[in-house]
Structures are given as structure tokens and as C-alpha cells.
Design a protein with these regions (language model features):
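Conserved glycine-rich "GG(E/T)P / GGGxP" loop and the immediately following alpha-helix
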Residues: 1-127
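Accessory C-terminal segments flanking Radical SAM cores
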Residues: 113-222
Length: 222
């Protein structure tokens, strides 16, 4: 919560906050996160993405009753999204904002590969990326995109302090300037070297396929 509070104190506005997983409703402090986001005048909209696999605990229902919040259910079918109808009934009963839809446009853009692109091609790929400004807060650090956050978390990339801003441990007096430099200061990320790109040209893939075992990952670590 310290990281989110520090971030909100250091920005002018946040048009959209997204709570993602895994499954965000498994996070035991989600009600505290929502309380912080909802009370901030800087935050315009909040989206919570759920896969409909679990029931929502009764103690967080009240925290969902805010006009800023929309809950988005991705329907992966009755076997996986087995609590979808329970959620829909609950959201209708409590008059909560929600949408429900099937998986949309899953592309081959999440695999970790050593793409061996030169700096010019990496810059063009980053410029064309549809998530190059979808900043991701993970474990107290703010990354430029979800891919950068995840390859670092998986230890496929040794992330220098240029790859993220340490929101939790930075001095508040310095954080706003750090964020400005981070947002506008780079032609591409180190994580781009492990990415296939995300510019809507990648092939569509079947959604929600699960691995039965871990697979080896390429690495840029020395």
C-alpha cells in the first residue's frame, strides 16, 4: 500500500487504474487498494479484471460500490469460469458496474524470446507497441509495461534501475522527477530485447491454454 500511496502523491492524474492477476480477487488487501484509489481525486476510472473462477468474499462487496469501478469478467467457458453466473447474479443484486465477454484478440505477444534485434528495430518496435504506456506497479516498482514487469519478476532479465522506478523506496521529494525521466526518457526497454512486439500484427492464439510444467526461459542475464 505504501507504493501505491507514494505513486498517487507523485502524479497529477491517472486516467485508468487496472487491477490484474492472475486473479485480483484473491489478493487479501484488494479492498484497501480500492479504498485508496476511489478516494483519490486523481484517479478517473478503475477496472478489475476477473476470470470468473472464484467467488468474491462478502467483506469486499462494499468496496466495489463506487461509480469509478467497472468489473470485467472474461468468460473462458463453464469449466474454467465456473463462478461466472454467481458473479453476475451478485453484481446485478448489488447494482455494480460490470461487463462480461469471451476472450478477445489473444496474440502471440507474451512469449519470452531473444529477438536479436538491433537498436533501430527495437526503437521502432517500442514506438509501435500498444502497451508502451501501460505502466505496471509490481512489488513496489513501476515498470513501463506488463511484459517488462513480468520478465523481470521471472528473472529472465536482470533489471537495472533504468528498467523501473522504485516507488516504495524512493524519496518522495525526488519521485516526481524520477517518473518524468522514466516515462519520457528512453527509445526502448531492455525487456524489448526479449519481446516479440505488440502492435496488432502478431498472430492470434487460442486463449487460456495452461502449461502442465515449467518451460526453460531465455535470459539476458550475465
Amino acid at each position: 500500500m505504501i507504493s501505491l500511496n507514494n505513486l498517487l502523491e507523485s502524479i497529477d492524474s491517472l486516467s485508468e487504474a487496472r487491477l490484474l492477476g492472475g486473479e485480483p480477487f484473491l489478493y487479501p488487501k484488494i479492498d484497501k487498494v480500492l479504498e485508496l484509489l476511489c478516494k483519490s481525486d486523481k484517479v478517473s476510472k478503475i477496472y478489475i479484471y476477473t476470470n470468473g473462477t472464484i467467488k468474491i468474499k462478502s467483506n469486499i462487496i462494499d468496496s466495489l460500490k463506487n461509480s469509478k469501478i467497472t468489473i470485467e469478467i472474461t468468460d473462458y467457458g463453464e469449466e474454467l469460469s465456473r463462478n461466472k453466473y454467481n458473479l453476475i447474479d451478485l453484481f446485478n443484486k448489488e447494482n455494480l458496474n460490470y461487463v462480461c465477454h469471451e476472450p478477445q484478440n489473444w496474440t502471440d505477444s507474451a512469449r519470452i524470446v531473444d529477438n536479436k534485434l538491433d537498436d533501430d528495430k527495437l526503437s521502432k518496435m517500442f514506438k509501435a507497441c500498444c502497451v508502451n504506456d501501460v505502466f505496471t506497479l509490481l512489488h513496489g516498482k513501476l515498470y513501463h509495461c506488463p511484459f517488462s514487469a513480468n520478465v523481470t519478476n521471472l528473472k529472465a532479465l536482470f533489471a537495472s534501475d533504468k528498467e523501473y522506478v522504485d516507488i516504495k523506496n524512493s524519496k518522495k521529494s525526488e519521485l516526481k522527477e524520477k517518473l518524468k525521466n522514466f516515462i519520457f526518457g528512453r527509445p526502448f526497454l531492455e525487456a524489448c530485447k526479449l519481446c516479440l512486439g505488440r502492435d496488432f500484427t502478431q498472430e492470434l492464439v487460442e486463449p487460456a491454454i495452461q502449461l502442465r510444467k515449467n518451460i526453460p526461459l531465455p535470459s539476458l542475464n550475465s
